C-alpha cells in the first residue's frame, strides 16, 4: 500500500482522462443541426418591471427644453 500513498495522483489523472473521453464521445453523438431545426419556442421573458415602471424616464423628442 506504500505505492498507493506515493502514486495516488496517477489514479486521479486516469480517472479524469476517462471522464474527459466519455464527455467527448457523448458530445460527438449530439446532432446540433437537428436540434436547431426542431427547437421549441421559448416563452416571453417576464420580469415584472411593468408593475413599478409606469412613468416615462426619457424625455420626448418633440418636447421643448425647460
Swiss-Prot record:
Keywords for the protein's UniProt record, in alphabetical order: Cell membrane, Membrane, Transmembrane, Transmembrane helix
Subcellular location: Cell membrane
Family named by the database record: Belongs to the UPF0370 family.
Ranges that cross the membrane: 4-24
Main localization of the protein described in the UniProt heading: membrane
HAMAP family attached to this UniProt entry: UPF0370
Lineage: superkingdom: Bacteria
GO cellular component: plasma membrane
Keyword Transcription regulation: no
InterPro entries the UniProt entry points to: UPF0370 (IPR020910)
Region: Disordered, residue numbers: 39-66
UniProt keyword Transmembrane, yes or no: yes
Organism: Salmonella heidelberg (strain SL476)
Biased composition (Basic and acidic residues): 42-51
Protein name according to UniProt: UPF0370 protein YpfN
Lipid bilayer topology: Single-pass membrane protein
Amino acid at each position: 500500500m506504500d505505492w498507493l500513498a506515493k502514486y495516488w495522483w496517477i489514479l486521479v489523472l486516469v480517472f479524469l482522462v476517462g471522464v474527459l473521453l466519455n464527455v467527448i464521445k457523448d458530445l460527438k453523438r449530439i446532432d446540433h443541426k437537428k436540434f436547431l431545426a426542431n427547437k421549441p419556442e421559448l416563452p416571453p421573458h417576464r420580469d415584472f418591471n411593468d408593475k413599478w415602471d409606469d412613468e416615462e424616464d426619457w424625455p420626448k423628442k418633440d418636447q421643448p427644453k425647460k
